Amino acid sequence: MSRRQTKDQTVVIIGMGDTGVLVATRLSRYFNVIGISTKPNLVSGQELGKRLADLSWWNRYYNTPLRGFKALADVEIHHAKAECVDLATKTVLVVDQSNDETLIPFDFLVIASGTSNGFWRDDHLRSEAQIDERLEQDAATIRDANTVAIVGGGPCGVSCALNIRRAYPEKMVSLYTSGDLPLPGYHDEARQYYHRELTAEGVQIFSGHRAITEEPSPSAGTIRFESGQSAVADAIIWSTGNRKPHTRFLPDALLDDEGFVKTKNTLEVV
């Protein structure tokens, strides 16, 4: 298909995070691409530990205005939230911060709206100033805390524990993991290595502590464990892998029981 032919077709991408931006930069060479983003920046979900412990560094590399990407120059970006997808008419209804509605037609739809995961990823409609305010609030929570608890021993939890302890050696940083060692599923040498690193940095590791998750998860106060034990901290970081998909705008027929999009192995919608 020629470039001119494909440019007559429109691809709408819902979600301009890491995946949405990457897809948009590739497809804009051949299609009219419209991106829908709840934030005017690419606010990456990567490196939470550095974000909390060294926000100025993190902002330089992981908080980038979408208008700053040259490869998105041909992409029409709507700072809005998707409210409804109508598959019959091939349209997406979006609402911006002024509560103005826009109906956007598409030939192809890419769903890259992501998930909520802990307190640092959400689908709230925010301006650049509101993004900066939220990032600073999260960093200040850690900065002002005397005791920090990280629940979950995966890569995110380990990164948070190490970065926070290195930035604030005076703080008591505790890592709670359900297994014997952090990083379940990783090579045993890697698990042993990071266990030694955490210990050397002064992180208190509590193995065999599976937390009882609450809704909403507390950001401070008491953590309760299945064993009946409990712990108290000034700041709590939940990195247990619980995710909530941002898919309320999609027809129920496209979703599984947990709200995730049902797809084939090719990531096409079933």
Please name every model-derived segment.
Residues N32-G35, D74, L125-Q130, S174-L175, ...:
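Preference for well-ordered, secondary-structure-rich cores of eukaryotic proteins
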Residues V94-D100, R224-S227, N265:
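Short acidic, glycine-rich loop/turn motifs
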